[in-house]
Amino acid sequence: MKGYRQSTLLICSILTILALMGPVSKLSAGENQPWTDPKNALIVDAYELNTIEWNAFLQDKRIAGFISKASDGLPESFSCTGDHAGDTVAHCKTMWRKYAVSRELFQTRRMLAKTNGLLWGAYHLGRPGNPIDQANHFLDYADPQPDELMVLDIDGMDTTQFMSLDDAQIFVAHIKIRTGRYPILYTNHNTAQYIADHRGTYPLLSRLPLWYARYKPDVKGTFPLGNWDSYAIWQFVSSDNCSEKSCPYRVPGTLTDIDVNVVPMTKIQLAKIWPQGDLLPAKPLPAPDLTIALASMCSGPRQPLISLMIDTVVTASTPPSTKPVEINELNYEDF
């Protein structure tokens, strides 16, 4: 039995090494600068302050889609009285004009994009406030058609600036009730990681197709992430990593503040799945951390190694016994 203890220690060592190494994964085609492959389609997203020279913009034939900012938080007030009266009335009127002009620009860009064969999508920037009112605001503003993509944008975890994840659950459920489709989720890595780690708490958010904002040349080791085997859309260019001197991809007719996205598929393939609307399959919740189990098994208090039934010499004075004999670290050499 000396070999038993040595084998146990060896197994513990091997399992510990494997646990620390984690899963081994290869770098898939969509993880390393997929925008450099001319077959992969590109998508531009913009808001009202991004300037676009459309004649030049439409010359880039890799651009397959355009996603525009639609609504932002709760709807604007139609009245500049009451809470808006007094010194803020001029500001209120200015904000309302900005809102009206932004909505008209949204509608104009949609007409231009779809007339020129681009796929169209719209996003709502989630803010603090009633999520059902925000969902209704988005639907009233964007008026999404069956062939258009819908997006909920959660820019971070700070609930003083952005919609909480609990409210986001309510938002997407209400969109589903009113349209028959779920939106996809736009967010950054930290928020996506948190949702994935708490997918039992956020069963809807964690199963929405992921529009992933990450400004690095690759996403090796990121996926699978919870229910997400990969991204649906990868935002790889923004003002954070694009300047006059250096930019991963430049779209003609735009400035360095434009957002550019890639999908690991052709324009034809993208068009077939563009409207989205379904939830991803739910994966089983993770088992307890292997390293914790190993710590308990290999580093815990001294435990019996094994219990065996020891055959004894049976005589009239020593009847057979069924009581197990414990073999432990103190007496294993006796056996």
Q: What are the residue ranges of the model-derived segments?
A:
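Alpha-helical scaffolding within the catalytic cores
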Residues: 47-56, 100-112, 129-145, 165-170, ...
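Solvent-exposed loop/turn segments at secondary-structure junctions
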Residues: 47-52, 70-75, 125-131, 155-160, ...
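Catalytic domains of cell-wall/extracellular-matrix polysaccharide-remodeling enzymes
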Residues: 149-224
